[in-house]
Amino acid sequence: MDDYEVVEQIGRGAFGSAFLVIHKSERRKYVVKKIRLAKQTERCKLAAIQEMSLISKLKSPYIVEYKDSWVEKDCVCIVTSYCEGGDMTQMIKKSRGVFASEEKLCRWMVQLLLAIDYLHNNRVLHRDLKCSNIFLTKENEVRLGDFGLAKLLGKDDLASSMVGTPNYMCPELLADIPYGYKSDIWSLGCCMFEVAAHQPAFKAPDMAALINKINRSSLSPLPVMYSSSLKRLIKSMLRKNPEHRPTAAELLRHPHLQPYLAQCQNLSPVFKPVVSKSEHNTNENRTGLPPKTKSAKTPIKHNQESEETEKKNKDTSSSSKDKERPAKSQEMSVISTLTLLREFQKKSPKSEERAEALESLLELCAGLLRQEKFDELEGVLKPFGDETVSSRETAIWLTKSLMNVKRKQNDDETNI
């Protein structure tokens, strides 16, 4: 620590503290993370040493920059770049209910996906993706940090330890099933939902209720200001079956993210869209995601060969035939929205605007119906009819409409 001046303590956790420091000769700000080794189990000590070793080898523009590390007085000290914007949790609190623009949200999502794709391509599973581990620079770019729970996977390996933060844990981890890279995709989906909605994707008063919500993928509607494309991207990361979740590389190929991807640093050409218009339409209609692609290979210094970590996962196009059944009201809302959107999108750009408005209306109505707020539901739908209708009639009409669309969706799947 002789080369640094301590300015203040900026964080404290179960295993250590973080300090804002200034390098004496460079006069540049850094963060020193001190991880206590005294009174820790051998497993915790090993994790601290592993974090020090791992982060020194990571080289990505969207991962916190490593500066130095050492061991002193039963502590592991890790020096990384300082992000003036704080973390995403702090950003949400400071916004005071004002939602971020879709442009900003998409830019952050792309940067995080590039960081995760880099990690996965180098066999690193983060395992603790959450808003407090995502940092913002003064230029409003993201940096992924805190690799204390990260794991380096061997070829075809899966992880099995139950680690992480409960609200961001995927269903397979909670079910004590070995998990892989798709667990990070789930956690990122939780983060993006929270940044968009200013509330956790899954929240409950106790662990049993939380697990139940996660297993049912019981999500509240996202704010109406965001497009249906962005909402579908976030929800695709929160599919219960990991085989039906897209990889980071697949998400980066989505047409909706291309304008933001082009603005990123050190962009690999493999993420540029190359599918024909007909192929693009086919994939959009069935899954909302483009076909699989190989991710960019940027090896880190441990010199293990990069691999196509998700090659055994099924194509995300199977998501249209997903046999899992979440809560009925949630499923009906999603199915009806997607079916109507597809019909509108075949017509004109004006129809797309109407489709997005319709999606927001249906999500709101489904939420009110689920909560049995029939009076509010009546108020929402009253402008669409010439005569006043009772809340009971409104609820019956909405339920029948959603069920009819569901039947149509099932018929369409049977005919494919």
From Swiss-Prot:
Organism whose genome encodes this protein: Arabidopsis thaliana (Mouse-ear cress)
Gene label: NEK6
Active site: residue positions: 128
Top-level taxon of the source organism: Eukaryota
Family: Belongs to the protein kinase superfamily. NEK Ser/Thr protein kinase family. NIMA subfamily.
Residues where ATP binds: 10-18, 33
Biological process according to GO: cortical microtubule organization; lateral root formation; negative regulation of ethylene biosynthetic process; protein phosphorylation
SUPFAM superfamilies: Protein kinase-like (PK-like)
Name of the protein in question: Serine/threonine-protein kinase Nek6
Catalytic activity: L-seryl-[protein] + ATP = O-phospho-L-seryl-[protein] + ADP + H(+); L-threonyl-[protein] + ATP = O-phospho-L-threonyl-[protein] + ADP + H(+)
Function text: May be involved in plant development processes.
EC number: 2.7.11.34
